[in-house]
Curated annotation (Swiss-Prot):
A motif (PP1-binding motif) lies at residues 61-64. One of its GO terms (molecular function) is glycogen binding. It comes from Bos taurus (Bovine). Residues 124-232 form the CBM21 domain. One of its GO terms (cellular component) is protein phosphatase type 1 complex. It comes from the Eukaryota. The N-terminal region is required for binding to PP1, the central region is required for binding to glycogen and the C-terminal region is required for binding to PYGL. Signal peptide: none annotated. The modification Phosphoserine is found at residue 260. Acts as a glycogen-targeting subunit for phosphatase PP1. Facilitates interaction of the PP1 with enzymes of the glycogen metabolism and regulates its activity. Suppresses the rate at which PP1 dephosphorylates (inactivates) glycogen phosphorylase and enhances the rate at which it activates glycogen synthase and therefore limits glycogen breakdown. Its activity is inhibited by PYGL, resulting in inhibition of the glycogen synthase and glycogen phosphorylase phosphatase activities of PP1. Dramatically increases basal and insulin-stimulated glycogen synthesis upon overexpression in hepatocytes. This is Protein phosphatase 1 regulatory subunit 3B. Interacts with glycogen, PPP1CC catalytic subunit of PP1 and PYGL. Associates with glycogen particles. Forms complexes with debranching enzyme, glycogen phosphorylase, glycogen synthase and phosphorylase kinase which is necessary for its regulation of PP1 activity. Keywords: Carbohydrate metabolism, Glycogen metabolism, Phosphoprotein. The keyword Phosphoprotein applies.
Amino acid sequence: MAVDIECRYSCMAPSLRRERFAFQIAPKPSKPLRPCIQLSGKNEASGTVAPTVQEKKVKKRVSFADNQGLALTMVKVFSEFDDPLDIPLNITELLDSIVSLTTAESESFVLDFSQPSADYLDFRNRLQTDHVCLENCVLKDRSIAGTVKVQNLAFEKTVKVRMTFDTWKSFTDFPCWYVKDTYAGSDKDTFSFDISLPEKIQSYERMEFAVCYECNGQTYWDSNKGKNYRIIRAELQSTQGTAQPPNGPDFEIAFDQFGSPRCSYGLFPEWPSYLGYEKLGPYY
């Protein structure tokens, strides 16, 4: 029996013998295997939560050498850019326009008084009393221009504007020129002036002027009822604001020598003046 098994085994091909009796030996694991089944669901179902171990993190801190009494490795002081900044052209133009606009606003001036001829009745009374009165005044680029009305007391007459640019530390007299008026009566004459403003005016100085009328050896002044005609910077006008009218009505009615009430300052302040709503042009 043993002989038959041995002969049968020896008669087999080598490949058949290896495939039939060969087997693999699994290597011995070096580390213990972890179970693939997790028990988290079981713990959650039972209502118990496995405790987790919280690791304590170490906070990071930054300290400099000079705080520890040591010397710094390198110290560099920046005074100017080594290379010029390459600013785009459109941004450069925008910055230049903003600077120029700010400068122009700070150098612009406005009139600090209303047009005298806006209230026709008051203007006529002042002309009758003082014999001279500023009619209109406008500010142009760097000049001030206007017209003056005077009573025709004599043929020979002189009209001038006395103006100061440094709060009356000094002043200059600017002559006015006669303007032929077709529609004006023979009892009134019109003069005009055009005064150039200095290039540099100190911000703390005031610009003021008054009108002088000389005739028959007499001198008459229009100083805006003692306040003078002032020219201020535009930025000051925005900060000062406009005066608020009184809450109650003014029942004081002033009558002029011509018998007409001054409705502009009497019972009817809301009525428009003779000139109209704009109140910018001459009364005639």
